[in-house]
Structures are given as structure tokens and as C-alpha cells.
């Protein structure tokens, strides 16, 4: 078996290497997930989120690439947990790739069983966009993070975070977006991170302003910026399970508090308190059970500190990494006393079919993205909030790998935008086709009772039919590749979710596929929330003419 890191070819430009643009897009996006500017550990095929991978191993990666290069326009490649297992003759409107990652029968859906299978080389953790080949670096989460903190500001601080301090932890692929999202909302952020390389990476990509390894210096800088009403983000080298209790000890209580460490995966995503990175790596190899025990104890202390800060006035929320569940399992009974970010701040957007819609320039030329920015500013000029986001993104966000953009578009808006982009490709206004996709964290594509579907109005938090329906609908609609994953964001046993990607290659056939997929995909999100009894979703379904046979 080939286990050695291979150099990954970053294909750009308008020259085809595969037999069609959809296969080419899948190849370029797979490789983009492993681009050194994008992936957390490309040498291990790890893209983000603990051990979220793009392919099971290097042998599988090589076979996927070879298959995509030779895949016909009426064939479909099947990927089973990062391994290419079959190619079948289908038809030209069918997806070119169907992906199923990390799916386990519910009674076996534990990290222990997953790790057993992983050791045997039988499974891979796909996270959300790692194994579905549509990760675009920290920008992929930054608008969602910006929207979350904007809603925190609206609910608690009069519409701005100016004059407030946010404390959080974790500066990996997801958490790395937090400091920029806070400063874009005018606030001050102290982001605790145990790995100095991750802090430096966020400084290099302008997601973070400065760093220190001293708590007193971080607090001093934060307080000064708060008093002066300035936006500032500070990376603090340390372990949150140690830093937060010290903050309480010295009487420092932040205005806003959250966390985006990879607590969903205690073995690979959380460093136990009192250990260096090297000591942690050694223990993880030597005695994984002891490592997990120590990591879970640290997570419990971390959550206890969050609860203590909440009691002293911090606006506190879980940012979707299942940290509350891990702490509760460790005996922290009050762990769920602070809410998850979706029910607290994001669900109204889901009711309108809005979610993290993204597009990528396969040409590799930033100008293609800037031209699409102009389309948003022109065609959606009545949406001031959206236009402000696009202007800020152009100014503040550095591309990682292939140039990309993200913005939250809803039902009707996505299909409209998709047609415009396809027309631009057809007219030669863009140098190559555009890939359109989204996070699995979307309005109708995930069942995750501790995150996206926490506290549903009708109690349907754990019903996983919706993401399965979403994947089926996207496949029959003609998405370019469709994925069904388990355990993304919150870990084994806690979520089922689906992804879709569709290519705008300028053809009339693509125009029809885009119209279908970019209507039904967010449409199911509206349906899922209307079915659960949300008035805004019911209103949206009626206004948009979405046919729900039992909607009163």
C-alpha cells in the first residue's frame, strides 16, 4: 500500500485534463482540499476538524485521481469512506461522483468502533466538506461566524461588538475564522490556541492581528482596545482548560464566550491540560485510552469554567463542537445550561432556506471571483447586509488555494445566481467554469441534535430522514457530486448530513441542472422547518409556492 505523501497537482486554467468539466471540477476540488494553504495536514490527507480527510489513504487518493481522469460523461464513480469502489454507467445528467463517508449503523456509531475500523483501513472520517471535496479554507466558515457574532451583537449589544471582548479557543480550519468575524463586527477577541503554528498561520492569512504567550499581556491589550473602541484580535498561546480557570481566578470575565476546539474528537482534536504538543502526541500513540480519559477530564474543566463565566455575566454559547455533550458525559450536569449557536442565533436564516452557499473559480484567477462579486452587488443591491458582506470579504479575506467566495443566499436567490454565473461562463466573461457548493451545515441537509437541529420546535431534533431526502433529491436533480456523511462537526453518533456540489460550465444542460438543484436544495430546508412548525418557514413556503401536500 502506498502510504507516502505525494505532491498534489494544483490544476488551474482553462485546459481540460479529464474527459469533461464535471470530472475536472471534482479532480481540482479534491486537490484543492489538499492544497498546503488549505489543508491542516496535507501530508496525512487531513483537511480540517481533527482527522477530517479527503481520501482514505494515498493509494486511494491515487486511484481516485486516475479514475476521475478517465471517467466518461455518462459514468458515476462511487466513493466509500474515501476509497473508490466502483464505476457504473449511468447518464449525463446523473452525478459524476456519489460519496458516502463515515456512515455506521446507529448502535455501532461510536468513536471506539470507528477507531477499530480505521485501524483496519476500512473507514475514513470525512467531517463535512473534507471528504466531499468542497472545503475552501477558513473563508468557508467565516461568513457564518460573522453572521453568528452579528446576531450576538444585535441581541445583546445594540448591533455592534464595539467595546466588547470575546474569548474563544481553537484556531484550526473552522475556529480560525472566529477572530476575524469578531473584528469585522467591531469587537476585541482573545483566541486561545495550544499550537503556535496554527496561531502563526492565522496571522499569515490575516485572520488574526497579533499573538502573545502571556495571559496578562493578552488581557491588557484587549482591555486597552475595548476602552478605545478599537477592533483587535489576539492569539493567546495556551490550553483553554487551563487559561479559562486562570481568567476567573484573576477576575477577568469576557462579554462573550464560546469555543471551537475540536472537542468532538477527544483523541485527535483536544490536547489534555498540562501537556505539551509533543507529550500529547506520544501519549496518543502509546496509550490512546488514557489520552481520551485525560482529554475528556480537561474538556469537563473547560466547560465548568464556561458555566462559571456565564453565571458572572458572559454571553455564552456552544459553537457546534459537541463540547457540552462530552462534559455532560463526564458528569458536568449543567453542561447544557448555555445554548448552541443555531437555536440561539441562526435558525431564522434556515427558515428562509438561507445557508453557507459558496463558489470557486476553477481557473485559479482571482479576477473571476471579483467579477462574481460585482454580480452580487448589482443583482442583490436591495440586500444591504449581503452587499456589505461582499465588500468586507473583498477587502479583508485572503484566498487559500483556488479563489473562492462564500455568502448566505436563500431560496430563489441561489437559482438566480447560478443562472447568471452559468451565462457568464457561456459568454466567456469568466476564464473557466465555476464550482458551486455549500457546507453540510445548511437549512435542510443535516440532523444534529446538539447543533443544527438542537431544540426543534416539534421535538424532531434526531430525525435523520431529512439529510437522506436531501441527498436523494440532489442526486436526481443532477448535482455534479453528492455526499452523505456521519459525525461531522460533533463526532460519531451525533449527526447525519448531506452535501452537494454543482458545476456551472456554461452549457444549456448545466443551466437546467442548476435551476433544479439550486431550487430544490434550499427548498427542502424551508420544508424541513415548515414541517416542524416554524411560522417563518411556513410563510416562506407559501410565498415561494413550495408544494407541501399537508401544509395548512
UniProtKB/Swiss-Prot annotation:
Binds 1 NAD(+) per subunit. Pathway: Amino-acid degradation; L-histidine degradation into L-glutamate; N-formimidoyl-L-glutamate from L-histidine: step 2/3. The active site is at residue 407. Its cofactor is NAD(+). It catalyses: 4-imidazolone-5-propanoate = trans-urocanate + H2O. It is found in: Cytoplasm. Its EC number is 4.2.1.49. Disulfide bonds: none annotated. One of its GO terms (cellular component) is cytoplasm. This is Urocanate hydratase. It comes from Geobacillus sp. (strain WCH70). The lineage of its organism: Bacteria, Bacillati, Bacillota, Bacilli, Bacillales.
